[in-house]
Amino acid sequence: MSWTVGILRASQRAGTVRANFLCLGMAPSPCPPAATPLGGAWAVAPASKMATVKCELMKNFTSEEPVRNSKISIVGTGSVGMACAVSILLKGLSDELALVDVDEGRLKGETMDLQHGSLFVKMPNIVSSRDYVVTANSNLVIITAGARQEKGETRLNLVQRNVAIFKLMMSSIVQYSPRCKLIVVSNPVDILTYVAWKLSAFPQNRVIGSGCNLDTARFRFLIGQRLSIHSESCHGWILGEHGDSSVPVWSGVNIAGVPLKELNLDIGTDKDPEQWKNVHKDVVASAYEIIKMKGYTYWAIGLSVADLTESILKNLRRVHPVSTRIKGLYGINEEVFLSVPCILGESGITDLIKVKLAPEEEARLQKSAKTLWDIQKELKF
């Protein structure tokens, strides 16, 4: 944060009132004559030697109004929230980064840590507070906060507890940044994206779930490992739920336009002698494996969220598999959010790509929707 100390001294000359403001902040400001003592009856803060040093160091010509091109706020400074913050900072995607968390000690510590490294990421304005006013006028708000599942707790009960948390978050976010876009990262992400959409009353293009963007990255990485090809050159999608019922679209997997299904008709099925279906199994299992070994997954999701952020704030119109409302598509009639390929730009989700799925893939997507709806229909708002 930047801390500003203002010292006001009034003097009257020739019937006019002149006010001098001495600021110990980033914006330049006029300085009083060196012989004039600071303070007096009008002082609102104690005099500081730094005021003299600043005035000796600089000659001010005009006041400077802060110009902000973009502002990102992150709600939640746990491992995932901070991985998102660092990934965004390293990409230089905004002029201001605001952090919000209920844990004041952790929040202050994480903020100071980032501020001390701001020289290396060219980001001078990193602010934080427990109060959502710090998020005011955000272009993008990223939600990583939420309740964790307790031992033996049902998924429905976990989601219901998160609904209560999201009610508090969304009312403040909407109050201070009514035109922002939302990226929901908290799990279960598809259901909580639906919750955020319902509570915010934002149009669906401005409420985005991180969804299967990371699942797809894992999928492409593992395909690339099998073929000894960089994952960027492996084209394939994971759609549906971010979780166990996700759908690998084997019918569309290709390398340089060559569909792998033309080379192996049984790819991704039980009849496949190469057992490519294990690639998707590894995608689903990988998060559990990482959690078992190190406790959390956060770096990959942080990089994934920064990738989505870049597409939105730079209006790149890239296609990402993110969670959005898909009622009326693929035979799905429930009010659910699932990942499908979407074009992301400055308005959020500008378009949805109507991917042609094989019958068995569409059936799995419908099953994924039912899994989510069975929980959503029981939620109390």
UniProtKB/Swiss-Prot annotation:
Record: residues binding substrate: 155, 187, 218, 297
Keywords on this record?
NAD, Oxidoreductase
Task: Give the catalytic activity.
Answer: (S)-lactate + NAD(+) = pyruvate + NADH + H(+)
Give the pathway. Fermentation; pyruvate fermentation to lactate; (S)-lactate from pyruvate: step 1/1
- EC number, as in UniProt: 1.1.1.27
The answer to whether keyword Glycoprotein applies is no
First-level EC class? oxidoreductase
Q: Which SUPFAM superfamilies match?
A: LDH C-terminal domain-like, NAD(P)-binding Rossmann-fold domains
Q: Which Pfam families match?
A: Ldh_1_C, Ldh_1_N
Question: Which parts of the sequence bind NAD(+)?
Answer: 101-106, 148, 187
- Record carries keyword NAD: yes
User: What Gene Ontology molecular-function terms does this entry list?
Assistant: L-lactate dehydrogenase activity
Q: What residues sit in the active site? A: 242 (proton acceptor)
Q: Name one GO cellular component term.
A: mitochondrion
GO BP, sorted A to Z: lactate metabolic process; pyruvate metabolic process
Specify the domain of life of the species encoding this protein: Eukaryota
Family stated for the protein in its record = Belongs to the LDH/MDH superfamily. LDH family.
Q: Mind telling me which NCBIfam families this protein's record contains? A: L-LDH-NAD
- Name of the featured protein: L-lactate dehydrogenase A-like 6B
